[in-house]
Structure formats: C-alpha cells, structure tokens
C-alpha cells in the first residue's frame, strides 16, 4: 500500500493523461464522454489517497479506496484499448474508401467490356495499368531502401514491452485488497471450469469426429478399446459363389468313377446302341495325371449322359425305360452336385476370368444352345457317327451352328 503514493508519477499514468489531453482538447471531443469521466475520477481518487494516506490508517477505508482505484484503472485501460482497435479497423474498413474502390472497379470493368470488341482501344487501359504498377513498385523500393526498419522495430518493441511492464506493476499494486482478491479468485474459478468443460466435452468430440470413432477417448488413447469400424460395409459377396456357370477347371480335382452306371432296357433297341457306345468308352485306359486327359475323360462322360437322356426321351417310354431315365438323371445330378461342392470350397478364391472381358455374347450363345437343344443334338450325332462330328464340312453341324446364333 505504500506504493500508492508513487502512482501519480508512474509513466503509464502520465501517458494516459497525455492521450486524454490530446484527444479532448485538440480534437474538441465531448467532455461528458464516459472515458474522460473515468479518468478524471481515477486521478481525483488517486490524489486523495496520496494526500490523506497518513490519516486513512483504518484498514476498511484504505481497502475500499484501493478497490475503487483498481476498478477505474482496469476500465480506463480497457476503453483505451478498445478505442485503438476500433479506430484501426475504421481506418482500414472505412465505408467511403470501400465505396470508392467498388465504384472504380465497376467503372473499369464497364470500360473494358465496351472496349472488348476493338483490341486497339484496349491498349490505353493496359498501358495505364502497367505505368501505375511500375511507379508504385519504384516508390515502395525507394521507401524500403531509404528507411532503416530495424531501429523502428527495436524502439517499437521496447516501447510496448515497457507499457506492459508498467501496467503489470500498477495492477499488482492495486489488486492488493480484499474485494479484488475475491473477484480474481472467482474469475480464475470460472476460467478453470471452462477449461475442464473444454477438455471433457469438446476435445473428445473433436477426436471422435476426426478419427470417426464413437468410443471413449480415454480408452482409445490407452489402447484398451478396439476401434469401431463402420458397419455399413456390404460383405455379402463373400457368401456368393465365384462362378454361376460350370467350368472345366472345376473338373480337374473331381473324383468320379471310371464308368457311369446306366441301366439299359432290353425292350428298347436304341438303348442297345448306347450300350455299345458305352462299352467303347469303358475300355480300360491308363490313368494320366495331366489335366487335359482328365478333362477329356469327364467331358465324354457328360456327353454320354446327355446322349442317353436324348435317346430315351425320343421313344415311347416303358416302365423299365422310365427307370433308366431316372438313373441317368440321378448320375447327372450327382456329378453336378460334386461340381457345386468344389465351387463352394473355392468361394474365397479370386476369379481366373479377366474382369475386362465382355461375356454377354457368350452367355447369350450358350442360352440359345440350351433353349434349342443343340447340345443334345450334337451328343446324339456323336453317338451315331463319332467320326463325322469332327468334320467341319458336315452339313448337320453347320445347320446346328446356325441355330445356335438365332
């Protein structure tokens, strides 16, 4: 409290008084301004406390006077700072200045649009712009060369540091009273509560929004909780089959018997031909480990089953022949079921067919072949005359080929 007597000679108080004198006497501003009233009240209270310091020995009276001085000092500094900031912004964003720029830009764009049709008339504004640009650049370069900025930066920095130091000293002297300490403690408590709110609510929300996580931020930071990936990913393709059609690659690892058990009816003469053909394929053959031999072998079995089905369906079916057809169908169904099991076992494998190949024409061709019964006709022709099927000039094969493309 002894330093209150020295505040009248403080440089910051003298500077504030000089600023008020220049503002209210030279610029003739209204004396009834709140800022001027605060400064006058502060000076009167400070002088009264300095003169009557020895007589005001009571603690309550001195404590109240220091609190009043503290409040007035804070309000004066806040008003001056706000005034400086507002004056700077008004100078930069002055309405008339902005209006002049807008009008000049509109007029210039109008002139350029009118002169757009004639390229020769555009030379004048372009030359003017180049001239102004060059002159402004020369003035700026000259200004920078002739003025040494380092001393200006040094003295400006020293001046503002000195102001901050004096403000801090005055504030520390005037804050040594009971009411100011209570207010400062409450303000610090509010600030701490705001910080806790920011750390507990806003920061976790920002972290979860940034990383796309909905879990507790503490568990995420401590690596306790697992990352919750988005659940909208469509993984249903893993449950589907890789291929819907039958491929010969699936026949490589397929274990099938060497012969098809096809019961034959003695009353059906066409079945006798199929028996002979079946006997031709049932001759013992040395097993080969190559894929091509296994493909040919299984392909012959499929064609034989198709040929037997077509021959049985073309004649009048007796009870015995009906049983034969059912057995053939059972063999074909068994073979297809085995193929399906192989494909299901390969569900996770990648397709071997190139993805960029257009299979629409091949699919339509195969559909026409199935609808027209071309596969059964080829199998029937092969069963009757196997040597004629390999002939390209066979008229029956040409006719079947034309029917496939319809």
Swiss-Prot record:
One cellular component (GO) term of this entry: membrane
Protein name: Uncharacterized protein L248
Disulphide-bridged cysteine pairs: none
Membrane topology per record: Multi-pass membrane protein
Localization terms from the record: Membrane
This protein's record includes keyword Membrane: yes
Transmembrane segments: 7-27, 31-51, 65-85, 92-112, 191-211
Species: Acanthamoeba polyphaga mimivirus (APMV)
Compositionally biased tracts (Low complexity): 306-318
Region (Disordered): 259-331
Keywords: Membrane, Transmembrane, Transmembrane helix
């Amino acid at each position: 409290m002894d330093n209150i007597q020295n505040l009248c000679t403080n440089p910051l108080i003298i500077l504030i008084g000089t600023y008020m004198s220049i503002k209210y006497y030279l610029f003739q501003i209204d004396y009834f301004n709140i800022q001027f009233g605060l400064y006058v009240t502060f000076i009167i209270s400070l002088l009264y406390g300095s003169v009557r310091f020895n007589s005001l020995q009571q603690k309550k009276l001195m404590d109240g006077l220091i609190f009043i001085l503290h409040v007035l000092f804070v309000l004066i500094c806040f008003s001056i700072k706000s005034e400086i900031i507002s004056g700077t912004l008004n100078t930069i964003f002055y309405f008339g200045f902005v209006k002049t720029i807008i009008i000049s830009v509109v007029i210039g764009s109008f002139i350029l649009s009118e002169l757009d049709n004639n390229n020769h008339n555009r030379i004048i504004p372009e030359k003017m712009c180049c001239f102004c640009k060059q002159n402004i650049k020369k003035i700026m370069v000259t200004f920078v060369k002739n003025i040494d900025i380092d001393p200006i930066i040094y003295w400006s920095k020293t001046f503002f540091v000195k102001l901050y130091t004096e403000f801090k000293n005055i504030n520390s002297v005037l804050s040594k009273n009971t009411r100011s300490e209570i207010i400062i403690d409450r303000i610090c408590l509010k600030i701490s509560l705001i910080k806790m709110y920011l750390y507990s609510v806003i920061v976790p929300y920002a972290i979860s929004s940034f990383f796309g996580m909905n879990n507790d931020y503490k568990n995420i930071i401590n690596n306790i909780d697992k990352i919750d990936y988005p659940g909208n990913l469509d993984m249903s393709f893993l449950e589907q089959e890789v291929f819907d059609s039958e491929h010969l690659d699936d026949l490589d690892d397929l274990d099938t018997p060497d012969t098809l058990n096809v019961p034959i009816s003695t009353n059906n003469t066409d079945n006798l031909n199929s028996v002979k053909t079946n006997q031709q394929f049932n001759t013992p053959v040395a097993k080969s480990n190559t894929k091509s031999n296994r493909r040919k072998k299984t392909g012959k079995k499929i064609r034989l089953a198709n040929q037997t089905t077509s021959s049985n369906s073309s004649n009048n079916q007796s009870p015995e022949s009906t049983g034969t057809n059912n057995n053939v169908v059972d063999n074909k169904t068994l073979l297809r079921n085995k193929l399906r099991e192989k494909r299901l076992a390969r569900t996770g494998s990648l397709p071997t067919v190139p993805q960029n190949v257009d299979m629409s024409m091949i699919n339509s061709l195969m559909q026409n072949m199935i609808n027209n019964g071309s596969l059964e006709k080829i199998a029937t022709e092969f069963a009757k005359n196997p040597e004629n099927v390999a002939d390209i000039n066979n008229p029956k094969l040409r006719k079947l080929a034309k029917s496939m493309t319809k």
